[in-house]
Amino acid sequence: MMLYECGIRYERTMPNGMSKKVTELYLVDACSFAEAEGRITKEMEPYISGDFDVVTIKRTNYSEIVENGADSADKWFKAKLMFVTFDEKTSKEKKQAVYFIVKASDINNAHTVVVQHMKTSFVDYEIATLDETKIMDLFRYEVNTTSSNG
């Protein structure tokens, strides 16, 4: 599976009663662009009254989804980690960039969540960047476990 970033454009009623076209970003776990479009359309239908358009779909480079599980975690952060390895052929340190999508309440919490997540890893790493994204939510792929044994 791969995460796709989908942009949804729709008309939202603002607090002052006026309507305004807005675009929101969501992540969808899917196998292809076509599946990502179908899934985001299905996921958004219950939440948006009226028409909406899927205006963008792009692949992301996230290798892991890291969540802290707290109800207060309502923001998504992009973490760039540098995995540090030793190349025995050249006798030099090598750094490889790896990207995580992290759900947390704020940037300090996101840092803590990444550190906690990496405690079980044997890889040396550095957190190179940690930035808040405009992503509203993530829709994971769910396997249908119900069977129909007639």
Regions found by a protein language model. Name each.
Residues Y99-F139:
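Mixed-charge, glycine-accented linear interaction segment located at domain edges/termini
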Residues E11, C31, K80-T85, K103, ...:
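Extracellular/lumenal glycan-associated surfaces
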Residues V66-S72, F139-G150:
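Short, low-order "capping/linker" segments at domain edges
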Residues E11-L27, P46-S49, K92-F100, F122, ...:
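A cross-kingdom feature marking solvent-exposed beta-strand/loop segments within repeated
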Residues D29-E64:
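Short, well-structured hydrophobic secondary-structure segments
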